[in-house]
Amino acid sequence: MMAVVDNALANDYTVLWGTDVSEKGFSRTKAIGIVPEADLTSMSGTDAERWGKLSGKEKEAALYKFDKPGKERVITQQMRQEAFDNYETTDDHGMQIMGTAVDQAGNDYYKVKNSWGVRPPYDGYYYFSRPFVAYKTMSVMVNKKAIPAPIRKKMGL
């Protein structure tokens, strides 16, 4: 799926995208979607000590502040399937992926045109991290020419 999305954008096609925006990792006011890594065992020293003293509610608030780039989860097909099977991921919104962007920490994002009209802070555009798109995508629709050749061949297109 991600190969199709990336190939479409690399070849000047947009992607119609069905996703789940009822997630904690999606902020309408900040116009961003992320999947923060909650298992921060790689922390050391004072960071680990400070994190260890936070309550569960405080940890969640820190993860979803949306104030700076942070570490995100590595998404697997098993995670996607489990989220679908237990109804954690549902198809509740459609948008159009227009392009890509990179944040100040070098993390990849997709620039997405929302159907809610022109709204701040980015005039109706939102930025979804690569892990968010990999995790919460329900469907994509692309021009068949946007599909990578090996996949097109397997599909008989």
Task: Report residues per predicted region.
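Active-site signature of cysteine proteases
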Residues: M1-L157
